[in-house]
């Protein structure tokens, strides 16, 4: 099913269409979710046993793991924030809205995480396809999200719905991407 048939033409537009490199240039060494949400994400990562080689896309200075994985590659938009990520084994600056390709070989990672940033992806189906490509067979893609956002940079489709709708949006991304068995 074509993307245009599922999402209206305006769905991936954003109020601020200026390059994300401008918006994310200032260092933000802050948490974007509260302590309860941070704890819940850490518990989820522990429950899913994300202990091997993990790629954290749309990352920043903290990756919310309670137990660090063996290898964590943090990929995000701000070099200072990524360098400050003490759990990261390595990091890369990348704007996935400009170029959604991931600079890794097929089947490189045991898991991929995207914490509170899936709503900023203007090309999510391309990103999800790349995630499926770099995951080892059976590896999870854990996309967590909240009700907080930078409203000028989040996609309009996200702003047009509620929390239940947000779950449906992300589930649809998984359903439309080859390589994922099911979204839970």
Which residue stretches match the model-derived regions?
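A short SAM/SAH-binding and catalytic strip from SAM-dependent methyltransferases
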Residues: 110-125
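Short alpha-helix
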Residues: 40, 44, 161-184
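A short glycine-rich, Lys/Arg-flanked "PGG" loop and its adjoining helix->strand segment in the class I
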Residues: 125-140
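Class I SAM-dependent methyltransferase SAM/SAH-binding core
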Residues: 36, 40-102
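A short acidic, Gly/Pro-enriched loop at the edge of an enzyme's catalytic core
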Residues: 99-112
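Conserved class I S-adenosyl-L-methionine
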Residues: 140-172
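Class I SAM-dependent methyltransferase Rossmann-like catalytic core
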Residues: 2-49
């Amino acid at each position: 099913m074509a993307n245009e048939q599922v999402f209206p033409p305006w769905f991936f537009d954003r109020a601020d269409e200026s390059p994300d490199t401008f918006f994310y240039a200032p260092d933000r060494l802050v948490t974007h979710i509260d302590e309860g949400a941070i704890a819940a994400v850490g518990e989820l990562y522990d429950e899913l046993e994300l202990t091997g080689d993990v790629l954290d896309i749309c990352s920043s200075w903290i990756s919310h793991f309670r137990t660090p994985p063996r290898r964590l590659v943090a990929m995000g938009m701000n070099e200072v924030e990524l360098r400050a990520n003490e759990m990261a084994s390595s990091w890369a600056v990348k704007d996935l809205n400009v170029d959604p390709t991931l600079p890794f070989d097929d089947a490189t990672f045991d898991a991929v995480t995207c914490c509170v940033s899936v709503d900023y992806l203007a090309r999510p189906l391309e990103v999800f396809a790349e995630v499926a490509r770099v995951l080892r067979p059976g590896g999870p893609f854990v996309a967590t999200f909240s009700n907080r956002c930078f409203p000028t940079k989040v996609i309009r489709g996200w702003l047009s719905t509620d929390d239940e709708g947000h779950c449906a949006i992300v589930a649809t991304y998984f359903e439309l991407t080859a390589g994922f068995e099911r979204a839970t």
